[in-house]
Amino acid sequence: MTKLRRGFSLVEMLIALTITSTLLAATMTALHASFRAYKFTTDAASTHVVSRIVMHRLLTMVRTGDQFGPYPADVLAANQNPLTSTYLEFISYYDANTLTKKVVRVERRDAKSGEQGPYTLYIIEKTYVNETLTATTDQPLLQGVTDVKFTLEYDIGPRLRRATVDLTVQPADTKDTSLHTELSAPTIRLVSSVMPRRLELEQ
């Protein structure tokens, strides 16, 4: 007579299923956390690169610009010069033959719906022909700006002697990540100073 082998009991099957499901859940949690950490790192790195590009562009525009603003009412007053502002304005192009000039303004604005806040850095370019406005372009330069300050040091004239840009940016798309991990998104702060090229040539 053949002896029957004893199979798993219902309790043993339930225990095995519980162990298996626990291992699968732990694996999925680890994969999910790894994906969120990867997303967090790439978003922060991307924002850092973009912020540096914007900073380099701002410094280049200041270096080649002319007739900067805002400027203090009294250049010799220590409480007015240097001047700190949330916007910067200057002439980026001028043609004496056609009387054409382009005025660029970089300013901080409250973020609109759909933009990462609290602020967005905008660049506005206005074209004048014989002092008549002929064209205007307005576009965002950088989102996720938490603060931006332009510190302008003037000489008698007033001529801009030195401009310091202090830019603080929050890495993009980190809110969703922070809900699932304990990662906190560090802000990116870039500070740099530049002198207009015309001033350097004069010196």
List where the protein language model places each region:
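Short, well-structured beta-strand/strand-turn elements
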Residues: 63-75
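Generic macromolecular interface patches on structured domains
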Residues: 37, 68-69, 175
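Short, Lys/Arg-enriched, disordered terminal segments
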Residues: 1-5, 200-203
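Short linear sequence signals and composition-biased patches located at protein termini or domain-edge surfaces
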Residues: 138-203
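Type IV pilin-like appendage domain
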Residues: 74-157, 184-189
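Aliphatic-rich helix starts adjacent to a transmembrane/signal segment
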Residues: 4-63
